[in-house]
Amino acid sequence: MSKSASRARLADIIRTRSFGRGEITLASGRKSDFYFNLKPTMLDPEGAALLAELTYETLRDEKVDYVGGLEMGAVPLAGAIAQLSWLKNHPISAFFVRKKPKEHGARLSVEGLAKGESLAGKRCVIVEDVTTTGGSAIKAVEAVKESGAEIVLVLTMVDREEGATEAFAAAGLPFRSLYKASEFLNT
């Protein structure tokens, strides 16, 4: 399937499985009359494969070592990207950032690394399923930077176009999205 065909098919899946209208309170605390819940798309076999494919194509030339983001939204996405990258013979490892470290065990903020493995000096991309203001992704960026990593990109599947671009620019972070909310609202 061509990139444009993959993108169109994924948009159809998102529209069917993950987009809705009706009043909702967003993670940012804002109210909205539409929403995206990408988990049904990320956990659908075809949706997961297309998200991984389009994301991998975006990252392929970035010389990325790791991909990850804030739990819960980034976990299935990071895993799918890591798996596809292995199949493409260009491995990109995955991690996730806890919203709050567990109060038992290793008490880690960044999970998924083997004993002795570190993000220090590694090129990382922060992925997110849906971005509104950028606040959640910036929390993940801060935790990953504390681990010594270089953030080369913040990549979201859907940008709600409600301030994230400006927030990332102010933080000096490159930002891209696979889709904009307006692509779904205007159809």
Curated annotation (Swiss-Prot):
Where, in this chain's numbering, is orotate bound?
132, 160
The protein's name: Orotate phosphoribosyltransferase
Q: Which UniProt keywords apply?
A: Glycosyltransferase, Magnesium, Pyrimidine biosynthesis, Transferase
Pathway(s): Pyrimidine metabolism; UMP biosynthesis via de novo pathway; UMP from orotate: step 1/2
Cite a single GO BP annotation.
'de novo' UMP biosynthetic process
Q: Which family does it belong to?
A: Belongs to the purine/pyrimidine phosphoribosyltransferase family. PyrE subfamily.
Q: Which reaction does it catalyse?
A: orotidine 5'-phosphate + diphosphate = orotate + 5-phospho-alpha-D-ribose 1-diphosphate
Q: Origin, by domain of life?
A: Bacteria
Q: Which InterPro entries match?
A: OPRT, Or_phspho_trans_dom, PRibTrfase_dom, PRTase-like
Q: Which cofactor does it need?
A: Mg(2+)
> Quick check: keyword Magnesium in the entry?
yes
Q: What does this protein do?
A: Catalyzes the transfer of a ribosyl phosphate group from 5-phosphoribose 1-diphosphate to orotate, leading to the formation of orotidine monophosphate (OMP).
E.C. designation(s): 2.4.2.10
Q: What class of enzyme is it?
A: transferase
Q: Which Gene3D superfamilies match?
A: 3.40.50.2020
List ligand-binding residues for 5-phospho-alpha-D-ribose 1-diphosphate: 98-99, 102, 104, 128-136
GO MF annotation list: magnesium ion binding; orotate phosphoribosyltransferase activity
The record ties this protein, via NCBIfam families, to: pyrE
Which organism's genome codes for this protein?
Rhodopseudomonas palustris (strain ATCC BAA-98 / CGA009)
**NADP recorded as keyword:** no
Assembly and oligomerization: Homodimer.
